[in-house]
Design a protein with these regions (language model features):
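Short hydrophobic segments within beta-strands
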Residues: 27, 113-114, 210
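Serine-esterase "nucleophile elbow" of acetyl-processing enzymes
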Residues: 78-148, 153-164
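Short glycine-/small-residue-rich flexible loop motifs, especially phosphate/cofactor-binding loops
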Residues: 40, 132, 235
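Generic structural signal for beta-strand residues in well-ordered domains
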Residues: 70, 103, 135, 199-200, ...
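Alpha-helical cap/lid subdomain in secreted, periplasmic
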Residues: 9, 22, 155-245
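Residue-level signal for short, function-critical loop segments
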Residues: 31-33, 116, 174, 213
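N-terminal secretory targeting modules
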Residues: 1-110
């Protein structure tokens, strides 16, 4: 697969939320190849997805009309940016004479930690990623730090993360299993990871560990067992923490 630094530069869960009476919104910039050679922008108006743009990446500067609506009252707009490409943004342009303001929000905060599944790689569109869907369902502000290929890694934790979440989900394990990590090793790492997370970023948060659910070769017999057996080791380790579900 792609090096992790390429996927890390493809930010996931980036959403532009604002209220406007403008009937149009144009985006000017470059949509560069990242983890994929295509990208998507999903546009939601007053809670309903009305546009799902799918375009090929290119180093050329282009202007994309994100929406074109009938003239009307102020609407709440949410634009979800690509999770698989790199966006170099030059300008966002509203119709002449229109007004816009950031959408008022005192929502609680959700931190999604994980690998490519959390990142939303190969989802139908950027708003189809489960972290985006969950944030929308719970009406929470999302910070998605999922990166393809990542594992339970203590060095990846940011103890000084300025984003203070109310909810944290951690979804690792499938890449740990594919790398041959033993059940004893993953259990020890999960305990160290959760201990540190609960003492820092997630000190005031509800924390949920999501174990791997499925992968195509999950029934393969590895020294660490099948993926289901490996997942059980993660769940058992996580269950030793009262604050973790």
């Amino acid at each position: 697969g792609e090096p992790s630094d390429i996927r890390a530069r493809c930010a996931a869960g980036i959403m532009l939320c604002f209220d406007t009476d403008s009937p149009t919104l144009d985006l000017t910039g470059r949509i560069l190849t990242g983890a994929r050679t295509y990208a998507g922008f999903d546009v939601e108006v007053d809670g309903r997805v009305i546009e799902a743009h799918r375009i090929d990446t290119s180093p050329e500067t282009r202007t994309l009309r994100l929406f074109d609506l009938p003239a009307g009252p102020t609407r709440r707009i949410v634009v979800t940016f690509p999770q698989s490409a790199i966006v170099e943004l030059d300008a966002l342009t509203l119709a002449s004479g229109s007004k816009a303001a950031a959408s008022a929000s005192n929502r609680k905060r959700y931190l999604a930690i994980g690998d490519s599944i959390t990142h939303g790689m190969d989802a139908r569109g950027p708003s189809s990623a489960y972290a985006v869907q969950l944030a929308r369902l719970l009406d929470m502000e999302l910070l998605n730090v999922g990166v393809g290929g990542h594992i339970y890694d203590l060095e990846a934790l940011d103890d000084d993360l300025p984003f203070k979440p109310d909810l944290v989900t951690i979804a690792y394990g499938t890449n740990d299993w594919s790398r041959g990590t033993s059940q004893a090793e993953i259990a020890a790492t999960v305990k160290q990871y959760l201990t540190r997370l609960l003492e820092s970023t997630a000190a005031a948060a509800s924390v949920y560990v999501l174990t791997p659910i499925w992968r195509q070769n999950g029934d393969e017999a590895k020294p660490s067992g099948t993926l289901v057996e490996f997942s059980s080791a993660i769940a058992t380790a996580a269950s030793t923490f009262e604050a973790v579900r």
